[in-house]
Amino acid sequence: MDYDVVVVGAGNAAMCSALAAEEVGAKVLVLEAATEELGGGNTRYTAGAIRTVYNGVDDLRELMPDLTDAECDITDFGTYTEDQFFDDMFRVTEYRTDPELVEILVKNSFNTLKWMREKGIRFAPIWGRQAFKVDGRFVFWGGLTVEAYGGGPGLCEALWESAKKRGIEILFEARALDLITDGNQVTGVKVRHKGKMEEIGAKSVVLASGG
């Protein structure tokens, strides 16, 4: 069977690519080499934390509408500006990151999480690791405030559920082995699915399996 888009990988980047393609009408297939119990790549083994620009609690409540007034009253979420995000990226990478890609990441971070929320991904404050108590109030530090419910495994499962609801097919135990090409054009993927070799045609292939 042929698809408009085949995505190799089923972690956060891969599934967001698949959801974005489906949003504009593409017929999408996702290939995950692991089983469903172990799938999701690095995403499964992370805490599900996602760094984003925000200008205060009102922004955070757009991402986390479950936040109560009582929780907000005893919490200082602070802010995390674009300049702080840029500084952190350049500090961590020792200025070896691509400036154009960093600008895309930083300037789109908040709207990307809003979009993920619209796709059904739920977020919560990282109370346990990123906040400490001062005079009875929780104070967040380090600019890392938001995590997906259920951590990495929860993020994987929420993304897969969102994709399935939208008709995106996910094949587990499907390892992409090679690209099919016609001249300089990629036309599909060679896959080993549960021990059987298959060739899957695609107008576009997204490689998102190397996190």
Locate the predicted segments by residue.
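Conserved redox-cofactor binding core of oxidoreductases
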Residues: 39, 100-198
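Glycine-rich FAD pyrophosphate-binding loop
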Residues: 23-43
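Gly/Ala-rich phosphate-binding loop of Rossmann-like dinucleotide-binding domains
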Residues: 18, 22
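Beta1/beta-strand and adjacent pyrophosphate-binding region of the FAD-binding site
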Residues: 1-13, 29
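Glycine-/small-residue-rich beta->alpha transition segments that form the dinucleotide
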Residues: 34, 202-204, 208-211
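Glycine-rich, N-terminal phosphate-binding loop of Rossmann-like dinucleotide-binding domains
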Residues: 10, 54, 209-210
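Core beta-strand elements of the Rossmann-like FAD/NAD(P) dinucleotide-binding domain
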Residues: 1-3, 193-204
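N-terminal glycine-rich dinucleotide-binding loop that anchors FAD/FMN and/or NAD(P) in oxidoreductases
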Residues: 44-80
